[in-house]
Swiss-Prot record:
Gene3D superfamilies: Ribosomal protein S7 domain
Protein name as annotated: Small ribosomal subunit protein uS7c
Major location category of this protein: plastid
Organism of provenance: Cyanophora paradoxa
Family in the record: Belongs to the universal ribosomal protein uS7 family.
Gene Ontology biological process terms in this record: translation
Function in brief: One of the primary rRNA binding proteins, it binds directly to 16S rRNA where it nucleates assembly of the head domain of the 30S subunit.
Keyword Ribonucleoprotein: yes
A Pfam family that the UniProt record links to this protein: Ribosomal_S7
Length: 156
């Protein structure tokens, strides 16, 4: 890792069908072995399932799910004087979206169901309704930060 300069953020282009950067981020998080066309197909299928179930715009459901599952604060390990402290840190917007999509992805893969599209659609609907495992994970992160708020002065 170079110390000379920070890496530039790459521009994320919106996907061709929904014209949304969030859908592109979700596709990139669902990639397996670099097979983007497969990831794209089951995400589009999941968005169609959401549209059938909810009867509303699937992009709004996706945005609401990401908004509900984005943590505001997280803990990071910081080693000070031989002991490691869990230091609460505020989450930047782009990191929050990344964390939310990562959690939605992992819990949708663990769900019971026939296809990955159905699992993902159900997880996104649950997250949009503020239920399910993704919301529990966010609340757990907030509880960890609350429990360790005594170490907030170790922030860097």
């Amino acid at each position: 890792m170079s110390r000379r300069s920070t890496a530039k953020k790459r521009l994320i282009l919106p996907d061709p069908i929904y014209n949304s950067r969030l859908v592109t981020l979700l596709i990139n998080h669902m990639l397996k072995d670099g097979k983007k066309s497969i990831a794209r197909s089951f995400i589009y299928e999941a968005l169609k399932i959401i549209e059938e179930k909810k009867g509303s715009d699937p992009l709004e459901v996706l945005e609401q799910a990401v908004r509900n599952s984005t943590p505001l604060i997280e803990v990071k390990a910081r080693r000070i004087g031989g002991s490691t402290y869990q230091v609460p840190m505020e989450v930047r917007v782009d990191r929050g979206i990344t964390l939310a999509l990562r959690v939605v992805n992992s819990f949708s893969l663990q769900r019971l169901g026939k296809t990955i599209a159905v699992k993902l659609a159900n997880e996104l609907i649950d997250a949009a309704n503020e239920t399910g495992n993704t919301i529990k994970k966010r609340e757990e992160m907030h509880r960890m930060a609350e429990a360790n708020k005594a170490f907030v002065h170790y922030r860097y």
